[in-house]
Amino acid sequence: TAVGCGIFTPYLENLTVNPSGTFEGTAITASSTDSMGAVISYKNNAGTNVLNTDIVLQLSADNGSNYTTATLVDNGNLDSQTKVASVSDVTVTAGTQLKYKIEFANQASGSKEARITGVALQY
């Protein structure tokens, strides 16, 4: 039988954390609404993120033409690392195409990093 030895060298890529940024969900078709709510789950990958300052949620019912900033409320921990925040009854411009946008601020590699792990919309 043959016996061999090999060396595996994984490819490493340096990641850069941007101090600010946004991401937007895809539209969900619903009955016409002018009031929305949401639940998000997130992790403080590094440091402690402040809701409504470092993590900002915006809601839209008109496919993102008009966003309304929501005031997130801390709902405690889902598990030892995952936190939950929510908002209800946010008045938005009426529509049938529900979307969310999350904005990040004050992020710094190794000292403050937010990781959003889930988003649920209510209408």
Language model features with spans:
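Beta-strand-rich ligand- or partner-binding modules
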Residues: 1-123
